[in-house]
């Protein structure tokens, strides 16, 4: 990584999205330089990563005369194995969309924008940020983003500015399940989809989801005889394809999982050796679920008690190659009041199956150390003195670390507490659409003195910049 980045380079890199890119120019690495130099009839193959979602499948861009003419999957990519979903195959539409923003735009009236140069945009944004920082302190700036490869640079930039307020998408998507598994296991595991023999999906719709490689593996597992059970209020594509669909009442997954735990413990179907050697709190869990019978759960979930008991026994019979999915959204994404506890119940259930680290169970990925931006050569950012605007990680929200609680941002902007938030930079994120209560989000955006939207389209949020 370069030790010195200009503001212009940083913000232009922030714009990179779509299948191959989405800033105003192609990334300047060797493959693209060769593509630019190629003759009109020569087609070059340039490996890259798909940016149409966060999974980042491997792609090969076919380039003729400096223009991408086709996108294929990269067969050497270890996860996607040369396959692309419909969104990935459509990546060129983002790259060459006639409505794609190719240069900065400045508001000149209600709903009116005019082009402005990069230098002028940086100069005006920098001057306004400097003025607001002098009036209200560096914490007056919030940077709202999506978890992407550029996040370390965003964090580094905010530290240099002096603001602790880097926030974003996670809390409106998957933070609750991440917190649930991290507080139970210490980390968020995945599922060994290719070898699972019994798979329970609490609301996860694999066939219409974004994990290309996971779909390939679960299809292979079913071909080998795995039993797939979909727990979902909706007859999704996955539910229709699974061996069994359980049409649960929305938001009642916790009751269902607690009843499964009750049956497995009451009938001593759990992995006793694993529980004795590698868990703590079993007796407390046993006492806690004593009254959570299948009959109790049936009245809440609309799933027959006999079905709940059968599913519990089938899961236990297939252990350790049985798994309750750790999901993405599903029954314990950031959608329900009890989502964290639902995720914790799923974690406890998997532990009772003794499937942690087992073939066909849950898997933990090794941590790869790639270095940190604060270890780069050059000036070190000063220690940030201000508290976060949302109190994430503190007494009120001790588990809400990382990117914090973006859904609370409109209230903070409108109330001015705990301090005034006057500037917001939004990158790879559309809070008007993603956050609850869009009207309140819009009201908050209109109260700001500076809103900068880094996007390739005139998104719902960019329209208020």
Report the location of each language-model feature.
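N-terminal export/assembly segments and adjacent metallocofactor-ligating motifs
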Residues: 1-267, 304, 425-427
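N-terminal leader/propeptide and maturation segments of large enzyme subunits in energy/redox metabolism
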Residues: 105-118, 269-305
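Alpha-helix capping and helix-loop boundary segments enriched in small/acidic/polar residues
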Residues: 116, 184-190, 205, 209, ...
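Flexible, glycine/charged-enriched surface loops at secondary-structure junctions
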Residues: 136-140, 270-275, 321-325, 357-364
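A glycine-rich phosphate-binding loop feature that marks nucleotide/adenosyl-phosphate handling sites
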Residues: 146-147, 277-279, 328-329, 362-373
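Extended redox/cofactor-interaction regions of prokaryotic respiratory oxidoreductases
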Residues: 153-219, 224-231, 238, 254-258, ...
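Core structural elements
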Residues: 312-321
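Short, solvent-exposed helix-loop connector elements
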Residues: 325-337
